[in-house]
Amino acid sequence: MQTEHERKDAGTITVPTAVSNYNLDCILSYCFDGGSGYWIDRIEVVDDDYRGAKYGSEVITHGGKLKVFVDGEEHLLTKPMLLKGCELYAIRRKEWRPDDFDAEDTDIILQYALFGDVVYG
């Protein structure tokens, strides 16, 4: 049996985790197909430049940017921001299982990406 001293956290470590373009596309697809619809007013592709992407949810992984409109304010979404949202999710939830994500998980990731925290829901 471990002593109280042995059970205490010694610190934390950051473990690099691969996030694929497919993961990012799926995250945004879930968000845009309803997961974040309760707080997002509308989404636009910056300069209407899809960069070869078939869907708006794929623009980020093709190097484009999105404008996300919320409560009359415009927020820019980029790939580095979305990756930061993924990182915050993994750190705060202590897991990264994109194959098991549902609309709630992806909504949280998008809010982390745009606001650094969960603001809605």
Specify the residue positions occupied by each region the protein language model found:
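Long, contiguous N-terminal structural blocks used for assembly/anchoring
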Residues: 1-65
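Alpha-helix boundary/N-cap detector
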Residues: 15-23, 73, 77-81, 97-101, ...
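Charge-rich, solvent-exposed alpha-helical interaction surfaces
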Residues: 26-30, 42, 81-88, 109
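Short, flexible helical or helix-coil boundary motifs
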Residues: 31-35, 89-93, 117
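Acidic, low-complexity, intrinsically disordered interaction modules
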Residues: 62, 77-95
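Acidic, serine/threonine- and proline-rich low-complexity regulatory tracts
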Residues: 69-71
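Short, compact, well-ordered microdomains
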Residues: 92-120
